[in-house]
Amino acid sequence: MANETKKRRAGYYWLNEKPYVSVTNVLKVIDKAALRYWFGQQVFLAVAKDPGLNMREALAAPYRTTKKAATRGSFIHNLIENYKPNPNIDINNVPEEYKGYVDAFVKWHKDFNPKFLECEKSVFNHEHKYAGTLDVKALIGGRKVLIDFKTSKDGAVYDEAHLQLSAYCEAEGTKKAFIVGLGENGNYQHVEAQLNFDVFLAAKKIWEFKNRKQLETLGY
């Protein structure tokens, strides 16, 4: 509808002043044992590198790394969004620390030859009151699919990405999706998403229970 107003704040998307919980916020309820290990490792490495750090400085190390990863992700996603009208990327103008990820994306694009239809689209599920931003809707082999890009050192793909795309596919009425993990080494993983909307809804129920007071205040 032309008169709809969409905003995003505090872990929610707002459509005509009504809150829709973000998909990524819901998925935070899922325990991530590997993330706890990574957090401890980052603190250990920071102290090993600089034994003079105090506790607060050492505990801040993982957050600095996370901020760098977010900046990297934003750069790569912006590049992907602009690749459709301008497929001739000058690799020499890409910051050195991002070149591997860009190489991985270019390889993937050449291998699968997608036709991008929409990028960075906000999607809403009115029945279940959630929303999110999908990376790309595209045609691959003549079939409409959703694609989510992830950047990491080794291009790994984690379970939460499957649930994220399960939610997006349900909102968009799409039956197939892919996760593309872009690695720092210039390689990629192209994985078909295992769509299971029921599991996403189960996570959402838990999230709603844990945040029930906040939801009541917001009139969710």
Where are these regions (language model features)?
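Metal-dependent nuclease catalytic cores that hydrolyze phosphodiester bonds in DNA/RNA
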Residues: M1-A131, Y220
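Nucleic-acid nuclease catalytic cores
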Residues: E97, K121-Y220
